[in-house]
Amino acid sequence: MVDFQLNNFSFDPVVSLGLAAFLFLLIALPISFWSVAGGSDSSKARFLVATSNLFLTSQLILRWWQSGHFPISNLYESLCFLTWGCTLAQLFVERAWRSPIVSAVATPVSLLSIGFASFVLPENLQSSAPLVPALRSSWLVMHVSVIMCSYAALLIGSILSFGVFLVDGKKQFNIRNSSFGSGSFRQSSELYLDERNENLNSIQPIEFTNAEQLDSLSYRSITAGFLLLTVGLISGAVWANEAWGSWWSWDPKETWALICWLVYAAYLHTRLTRGWQGKKPAILAIAGFFVIIVCYIGVNLLGVGLHSYGWFFDT
């Protein structure tokens, strides 16, 4: 590990880059709230989040160079990777809808993640260590990175669903906000087609409410996360069969990952087959948010099972 010392002061560039990312997210959060309150754009907050993502990218590359393996082998590295994924997912969502509401709702997730990694984890879990033999496999990058990216997309999608409750109160959703996205078009009732030239200007975009936009973007993010989670679970099963001769061992992490998959499968099922929109599917998405927290943080802190990084109760 690269570690500079000056007058008994230790400077770890990897940890410092994580702190820089935390600082930029910390500044971005109140700016997002002020933008929502003032009705201004979120370009400043978006710039800070993008800069934070660049810090995290540099941090992960540096840790990869230091350790010689993909930087996701302990809880600190995985939290930094999760924060990287969350900020990237947030930037993609804001590209689709440039509203300060997205930044105000999504930034706290990334801030808490990198804050937990930087200030709560003990120093021994922040340091890189050689991989155990079972993890020295090409499946490490495939399985773990895909799972972490799925968590990032699902967390951002779920927190956007929570935003549905915050921005529109008891307003009922119109069926026009299709689960397939917010790019629908309708024909204006105030204009008519000229029979001779069939003027296409009569086709005008629907104007969606903030809650409808959040609902649609949440659906898209969760769909992407669910697909990634499915790929991650399948790749994990293949890796487990190669390493231990068993596709599924009902390890605590595996069990909670399956519960997570089922919750989000129910979310997508209700939207696609029952036409649920707004608050009803949002409740399932929020439930999935807490299931991910238990699956990712809760099981790890107990220090049990093959997937745990360990901490409090790990002997």
From Swiss-Prot:
Protein family (similarity comment): Belongs to the CcmF/CycK/Ccl1/NrfE/CcsA family.
Biological process per Gene Ontology, one example term: cytochrome complex assembly
Complex formation: May interact with ccs1.
Compartmental location: Cellular thylakoid membrane
PANTHER family the UniProt entry points to: CYTOCHROME B_B6 PROTEIN-RELATED (PTHR30071:SF1), HEME EXPORTER PROTEIN C (PTHR30071)
Annotated protein name in UniProt: Cytochrome c biogenesis protein CcsA
Gene Ontology cellular component annotations, sorted alphabetically: plasma membrane-derived thylakoid membrane
Pfam families recorded: Cytochrom_C_asm
Role of this protein: Required during biogenesis of c-type cytochromes (cytochrome c6 and cytochrome f) at the step of heme attachment.
Record membrane topology: Multi-pass membrane protein
This protein's record includes keyword Transmembrane helix: yes
Lyase in keyword set: no
